[in-house]
Amino acid sequence: VARTGWDMGIDADEAVVSMKIGEKDTTNHQHNDSGTFQTYYNGYLTGDSSIYALYGTVNDFAWSKETIGHNGLLIYDPNEVSNQTPVVTGGMTRRSPNVMKLESLLTDTYTRAKVIGQEFGPDPIDPEYTYISGDLTPGYTENKVSEVRRSMMFMPTENKEAPAVFFVMDKIVSK
């Protein structure tokens, strides 16, 4: 999470960004939202586009928990088949069984992304930038991509009308 300050409320001139890499897939209630972000400035600007409805409904499995219901990367493969949703949206895949033991989370079976870089500073209390980068390749099917990376950077400004700059940079190598 990166922010321009700590004032709260709808009238506050603070910008806040939440950047998520989401390394492990714990299945069940887990969403396919690795590499997503949410932005807030005088109100909610970006993030999830779905209202979490009833568990187990088509909306729950085909939208709310899927990449398409967030602002993740959709990489469409016309030959892809889904065993989880009624439609193929190009989002991340679910291939992990339910987690039964905590130790199993340490295996590659449950890895959907890896943080490959993060930094903020130089002042840890009032940083000039916040950066995170992740390898999202494990979250997509092997026959679709050989590399998927997303990097995000947040930089506060001194401008009250535009209190921050937020960059999202993607690298996708398809097969």
Regions found by a protein language model. Give the residues of each.
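Catalytic and substrate-binding regions of extracellular carbohydrate-active enzymes
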Residues: 1-175
